[in-house]
């Protein structure tokens, strides 16, 4: 199979490496928007910026330039979009006439700026695709995964999500191998809600750990956060069982507890007294939870879904609250039944 990965960040590079190492002998092209980055990776045969020290196999080619031109030149059977959420709309617009399946790796909602939004903001990835490239056969590859571990060939499990059975099957064929298990799921709404909400919740657990509130508090945040994720997903049309799977519980546990989690590290930084800008700058990478948190809370409000943890995260990010005030409000809420539908 011929595969092209658009986006040479950590995760795009990791997935290109995984595909290039597949026993089936895939021919893989890793595309970088910056031609200088592509040249540097070609010369060093590694991505020194995002995954230093991990060598590129001979089966991995490099490309840059116009995405449509790169797609045509490599004659790919499958295109993977590995941009952040902020770049997904533009990339799908460039690939809107592609005749091969396209899948994205980003997790989140389009960002809604403080104080407003436009009709082009606040959507999940599959909604963006339906809006700008409705003819694409498309899906998502998601689940609990840190780029470094996947690139190192450590055991990882992901979910190939699409309403199109052919897309699911092609993603499994492309990536399922000795170190990467890929499960198929037609519930793309549930998979994308899980991938978005877990980032917001990981900021909360980072704050919890940074404030040394204890493991009891962390367990409570993860569990009640999973309830918030499930309520929003069900209201958006997802299946309940999806949230007990890799893209729900699995991704939440990893992102909320793992030291490589960017969103958790934002929470840790805020707990140390850094401003949001300082916390984001210290990462050097995108933390999607910072940008999609407002959308999560807005869509929950539109649907009448109660998400108190996510709401407190947004108040903190917007500078309208402090961590201690957020804890006091969450603990001071009226008693409620553990299991409820909204």
UniProtKB/Swiss-Prot annotation:
Subcellular location: Cytoplasm
Catalytic activity: sn-glycerol 3-phosphate + NAD(+) = dihydroxyacetone phosphate + NADH + H(+); sn-glycerol 3-phosphate + NADP(+) = dihydroxyacetone phosphate + NADPH + H(+)
Listed pathway(s): Membrane lipid metabolism; glycerophospholipid metabolism
Keywords, alphabetical: Cytoplasm, Lipid biosynthesis, Lipid metabolism, NAD, NADP, Nucleotide-binding, Oxidoreductase, Phospholipid biosynthesis, Phospholipid metabolism
Chain sites annotated for binding NADPH: 11, 33, 107, 147, 262, 286, 288
GO MF: glycerol-3-phosphate dehydrogenase [NAD(P)+] activity; NAD binding
Annotated GO biological process: carbohydrate metabolic process; glycerol-3-phosphate biosynthetic process; glycerol-3-phosphate catabolic process; glycerophospholipid metabolic process; phospholipid biosynthetic process
Keyword Oxidoreductase: yes
Location of the active site: 198 (proton acceptor)
Lineage top rank: taxon: Bacteria
Keyword NADP: yes
Any one cellular-component term (Gene Ontology): cytosol
EC number in record: 1.1.1.94
Main location: cytoplasm
SUPFAM superfamilies linked to this entry: 6-phosphogluconate dehydrogenase C-terminal domain-like, NAD(P)-binding Rossmann-fold domains
Residues where sn-glycerol 3-phosphate binds: 107, 143, 145, 198, 251, 261-263
Function, as annotated: Catalyzes the reduction of the glycolytic intermediate dihydroxyacetone phosphate (DHAP) to sn-glycerol 3-phosphate (G3P), the key precursor for phospholipid synthesis.
Similarity field: Belongs to the NAD-dependent glycerol-3-phosphate dehydrogenase family.
Name of the molecule in the record: Glycerol-3-phosphate dehydrogenase [NAD(P)+]
